[in-house]
């Protein structure tokens, strides 16, 4: 049995200092029934907690570390920038360099604005969509997470396509009424919503691959249908690629699926592990953002040289060949997990998009949030705890996916499959 004495003590102290002892809720490990692991360091595909335990890491800071921990080029770039100054409140050339890379690789982006988080990116994109179209309502999908902006912390009302209800205390009902929620992968509900509210829908915001109900790819024709419906009704299509951007493909989710939105939100990978976000799109739309246009958005540390340098060094190391290797390694892990579950007769469904993998402990195909909720959460929690014992660090939630990096080796994947085999053999009874 591994020992976690130092993590337990650190969490006890943290609970007097921060809400729930953490700075983001999922880090409390509540849904898996254990104390959080306090990490000390990471290198490559491994992380090490403060008790000295080593893990193969599939969290990767929730996706940004596509080259693993402490990538040499990223670390050297950060050292060089920090020695010259961490932020100036004035433009720097590294902003241009990262912006050029983003524009070259993301089909929808002609102009990009850097911000400090994915939440900032989505909030700003919604304001831009409303300002550009002169409309008030947005349409989002149940179970898709777009950050913690008030307009996006909305749950479904009753009926097929309804005005939303607040999903957190502190979100005014008046804000919620401008958000329409429908089921992910349900194009007919989207069409119905436009029949009811079309003249006032500014945009549809969607993750090309839903990543916060586990990993749920789009059904064939779904993204294409959204593109068609929004164009027909004069609404903008926004892809939230904070998670999928440069993760599922060289040209992001939109390149992977061949559908080009009007606006795209980015984060995670483009910061190389530092706080970052971005939104961009057609020049005609983006020129409405201040100071070139009337739609306001600003940020003290937006485009700061540390994040820009880390992002630039991260992206320049990604090539089309990187994603060929991602596919090979992800297929290997997916097949191994499936074989282990089948061997022990454990109900399961595995979804994958590029280097994102989600395993659900259910017999039901998972194409939306309702299906994801059919998973056996108690089994997942037990599986999670056993995988920790076997030295594998997974996201501590059934509704989060695994991420691969360029530095995960075949040996890492083989060890992970072996760990899953042991875990499932212990839990099958």
Curated annotation (Swiss-Prot):
A single cellular component GO annotation: cytoplasm
Top-level taxon in the UniProt lineage: Bacteria
Residues annotated with N6-(pyridoxal phosphate)lysine modification: 268
GO BP, sorted A to Z: protoporphyrinogen IX biosynthetic process
Cofactor section: pyridoxal 5'-phosphate
Pathway note: Porphyrin-containing compound metabolism; protoporphyrin-IX biosynthesis; 5-aminolevulinate from L-glutamyl-tRNA(Glu): step 2/2
Catalytic function, reaction form: (S)-4-amino-5-oxopentanoate = 5-aminolevulinate
Keyword field: Cytoplasm, Isomerase, Porphyrin biosynthesis, Pyridoxal phosphate
GO molecular function: glutamate-1-semialdehyde 2,1-aminomutase activity; pyridoxal phosphate binding; transaminase activity
Keyword Cytoplasm annotated: yes
Primary residence: cytoplasm
Subcellular location, record wording: Cytoplasm
EC number, UniProt record: 5.4.3.8
Pfam families, A to Z: Aminotran_3
Subunit structure: Homodimer.
Family: Belongs to the class-III pyridoxal-phosphate-dependent aminotransferase family. HemL subfamily.
Protein name: Glutamate-1-semialdehyde 2,1-aminomutase 2
Organism in which the protein naturally occurs: Bacillus anthracis
Gene: hemL2
């Amino acid at each position: 049995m591994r020992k976690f004495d130092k993590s337990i003590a650190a969490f006890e102290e943290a609970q007097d200092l921060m809400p729930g002892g953490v700075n983001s809720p999922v880090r409390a490990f509540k849904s898996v029934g254990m104390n959080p692991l306090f990490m000390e360091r990471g290198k490559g595909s491994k992380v090490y907690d403060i008790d000295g335990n080593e893990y193969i890491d599939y969290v990767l800071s929730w996706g940004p570390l596509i080259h693993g921990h402490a990538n040499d080029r990223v670390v050297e770039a950060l050292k060089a920038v920090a020695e010259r100054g961490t932020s100036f409140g004035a433009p720097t050339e590294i902003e241009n360099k990262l912006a050029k890379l983003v524009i070259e690789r993301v089909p929808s982006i002609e102009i990009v604005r850097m911000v400090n988080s994915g939440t900032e990116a989505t909030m700003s994109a919604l304001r831009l969509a409303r300002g550009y179209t002169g409309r008030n309502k947005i349409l989002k999908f149940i179970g898709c997470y777009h950050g913690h902006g008030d307009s996006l912390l909305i749950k479904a009302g009753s009926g097929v396509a309804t005005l939303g209800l607040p999903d957190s205390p502190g979100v005014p009902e008046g804000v919620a009424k401008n958000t329409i929620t429908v089921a992910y992968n349900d194009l007919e509900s989207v069409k119905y919503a436009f029949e009811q509210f079309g003249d006032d829908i500014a945009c549809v915001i969607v993750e090309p691959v839903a990543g916060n109900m586990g990993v749920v790819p789009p059904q064939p024709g779904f993204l294409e249908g959204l593109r068609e419906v929004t164009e027909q009704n004069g609404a903008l299509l926004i892809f939230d690629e904070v998670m999928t951007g440069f993760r599922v493909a060289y040209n992001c989710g939109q390149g992977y699926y061949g559908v080009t939105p009007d606006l795209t939100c980015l984060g995670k990978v483009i910061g190389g592990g530092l706080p970052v976000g971005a939104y961009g799109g057609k020049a005609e739309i983006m020129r409405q953002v201040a100071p070139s246009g009337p739609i306001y958005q600003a940020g003290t540390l937006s485009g700061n040289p540390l994040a820009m340098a880390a992002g630039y060094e991260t992206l320049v190391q990604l090539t089309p060949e990187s994603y060929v290797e991602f596919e090979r390694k992800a297929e290997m892990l997916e097949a191994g997990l499936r074989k282990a579950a089948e061997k022990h007769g454990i109900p399961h469904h595995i979804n994958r998009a590029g280097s994102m993998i989600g395993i659900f402990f259910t017999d039901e195909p998972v194409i939306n949030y309702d299906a994801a909720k059919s998973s056996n959460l108690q089994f997942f929690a037990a599986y999670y705890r056993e995988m920790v014992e076997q030295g594998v660090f997974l996201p501590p939630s059934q509704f989060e996916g695994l991420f691969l990096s360029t530095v995960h080796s075949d040996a890492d994947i083989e060890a992970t499959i072996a760990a899953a085999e042991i875990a499932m053999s212990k839990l099958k009874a």
